[in-house]
């Protein structure tokens, strides 16, 4: 059975992923805060990310960790960048498998939709730029 490591598994998308994937995959569920059935993993901690990926050797990582408060990102762009960019970079720097990263339509300016994964980005907010 393939192993999937899910970051941010305690969020809304995380719960849905766990429900939809648990019967077909071996799931390693992580979150910044500890909870039942979830390993604590701070994706800003390069060593913790590296050690977790080495220990579990997942086939796939689904990154659901994100700072999703759009107004909060505007008020604290440093934190938005740390969560939505630097944490993802830590995963990419330590993982050669398949990464599924959830982005946002905020990476676009809203002028030329509908968009797909090949559309050129043009964020108009801190949140969009951080994603």
Q: Residue spans of the language-model regions?
A:
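N-terminal Rossmann NAD(P)H-binding glycine-rich loop of SDR-like oxidoreductase domains
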Residues: 2-24
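SDR active-site strand-loop-helix element
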Residues: 7, 30, 61-65, 99-104, ...
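Conserved glycine-rich Rossmann-like NAD(P)H-binding loop of the short-chain dehydrogenase/reductase
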Residues: 12, 25-34
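Rossmann-fold cofactor-recognition segment
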Residues: 32-47
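NAD(P)H-binding glycine-rich loop region in Rossmannoid oxidoreductase-like domains
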Residues: 43-83
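NAD(P)-cofactor binding segment of oxidoreductase domains
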Residues: 75-100
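Catalytic helix-loop patch of NAD(P)-dependent Rossmann-fold dehydrogenases
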Residues: 82, 86-87, 107-131
């Amino acid at each position: 059975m393939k192993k999937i490591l899910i970051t941010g598994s305690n969020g809304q998308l995380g719960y849905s992923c766990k429900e939809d994937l648990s019967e077909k995959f071996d799931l390693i569920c992580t979150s910044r805060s500890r909870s039942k059935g979830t390993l604590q993993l701070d994706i800003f901690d390069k060593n913790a990310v590296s050690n977790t990926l080495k220990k579990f050797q997942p086939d796939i990582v689904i990154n659901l960790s994100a700072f999703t408060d759009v107004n909060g990102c505007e008020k604290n762009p440093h934190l938005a960048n740390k969560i939505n960019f630097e944490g993802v970079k830590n995963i990419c720097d330590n993982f050669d498998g398949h990464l599924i990263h959830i982005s946002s339509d905020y990476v676009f300016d809203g002028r030329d939709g509908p968009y797909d994964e090949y559309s050129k980005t043009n964020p108009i907010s801190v949140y969009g730029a951080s994603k």
